[in-house]
Regions:
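N-terminal export signals
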Residues: 5-24
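Active-site neighborhood of thiol-dependent amide/isopeptide-bond enzymes
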Residues: 155-162, 170-250, 257, 272-275
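Acidic low-complexity segments
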Residues: 80-82, 102-178, 182-196
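Short, hydrophobic/aromatic-enriched beta-strand segments in well-ordered soluble domains
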Residues: 36-40, 51-53, 101-113
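Active-site rim recognition segments
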Residues: 230, 234, 238-353
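Solvent-exposed beta-strand/loop surfaces of large extracellular or lumenal domains
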Residues: 60-93
Length: 353
């Protein structure tokens, strides 16, 4: 089967063509290399159709993409980027003249654990302003603004880190993980607050942190990705190498004048409480709570921070986020939360030199 490189066909080639300098930089202590494979089989589907896959992105000083390749039969396959958030996306389309055949899309990348850094803000404020704005599922007025105002009123200072910590603590204390929610949740934060039901999964709980932070004047965003390896913290916060088709996870970060983008993950605190059957007061949970305000364990790969956005090329409607494969064939929309029904597997493996 002929192997092709997306790097040779896409306008984004320089983004994913790792230089010798970059490869050397990710060979040092603390870096781990992984391969992530999408194995797609849509051969049972008829009619014209399109497929979109979220891909790893280069991110800060904690994640570097080395290579993205594909093999199979995918007419017009290309690496694309949405024009607003820059989310890297694999796209393929079929005209209906023949059925799709099995396809594999592979990414090789390196990650290292991400602590809070000391970093000056960029002079260009465009990015900060973008991540203060509301979206369809993330309003920053009404009950969201009222709730944020009550929370930060109790903060001990006006510093963004202090106000963000007040919101983080409120999230940990008041939300809970609801295991019956499909996938990672929708992140409809107005509904959560108006209903008084603060249960959900990562895209609900961490979106609530982001929305409250924005309403309090703190730039913040979700980061969508998938777990690719075991955790050194709790077993439930990792995924053994192999089939990670259902290991998607959303995290969050906020912008600080002293530290740049600061990683947080209150949803994983609540996940550990539920799955480890430990109370918030347990010493291991208290330690995790402190750690996850300003730290990400990078047994996970970041895809993008796109929220309520249009795919490229456009799909029938905007998506709340792109963390799962997405496809449209004829009148059918394939739900990436059900890997077997969709026809895909995601497989991860650590690359050990």
């Amino acid at each position: 089967m002929k192997r092709r490189s997306l790097l040779a066909h896409a306008a984004l080639a320089p983004l994913y063509l790792a230089s010798a300098r970059l490869l050397a930089a990710t060979a040092g202590a603390g870096w781990r290399s992984y391969a992530l494979d999408y194995e797609i089989d849509l051969s049972a589907l008829k009619g014209p159709g399109q497929l979109w896959l979220p891909l790893p992105q280069d991110a800060g000083d904690y994640q570097r993409v080395r290579e993205i390749t594909w093999r199979g039969d995918a007419p017009g396959a290309a690496l694309r980027r949405d024009p607003v958030y820059g989310a890297p996306i694999f796209h393929a389309a079929w005209d209906g003249a023949r059925r799709p055949r099995p396809l594999t899309v592979s990414a090789v990348f390196a990650t290292r654990d991400r602590p809070m850094a000391r970093q000056a803000l960029p002079r260009d404020t465009t990015e900060a302003e973008r991540f203060l704005q509301p979206t369809v599922h993330m309003p920053v007025d009404g009950i969201v603004a009222e709730t944020a105002g009550r929370i930060v009123k109790e903060a001990t200072s006006a510093a963004p880190e202090t106000r963000a910590r007040a919101i983080y603590d409120w999230i940990v204390d008041n939300t809970f993980r609801e295991p019956t929610v499909r996938g990672c949740g929708l992140g409809d934060i107005r509904f959560m607050l108006e209903s008084g039901n603060l249960g959900g999964k990562c895209a609900d709980i961490n979106s609530l942190f982001v929305g409250l932070a924005r309403a309090a004047g703190i730039p913040a965003r979700e980061v969508y990705g998938v777990r690719v390896g075991p955790s050194a913290q709790f077993d439930c916060l990792g995924k053994p190498a192999g089939d990670v088709s259902g290991a998607q996870h959303c995290r969050a970060e906020f912008l600080s004048a002293n530290h740049g983008w600061v990683p947080v993950d209150p949803a994983d605190v609540r996940k550990a409480v539920l799955e480890e059957k430990l109370p918030l007061e347990h010493e291991r949970i208290r330690a995790l709570r402190e750690r996850l305000f300003g730290y990400w364990e990078m047994n996970w790969v970041a895809f993008n921070h796109a929220r309520d956005f249009e795919l490229s090329p456009r799909a029938r409607a905007p998506l709340p986020y792109l963390m799962y494969p997405y496809a449209e064939f004829g009148d059918t929309t394939l739900d990436g939360r059900d890997a077997a029904a969709f026809g895909f597997r995601i497989v991860s493996r650590e690359i050990v030199a």
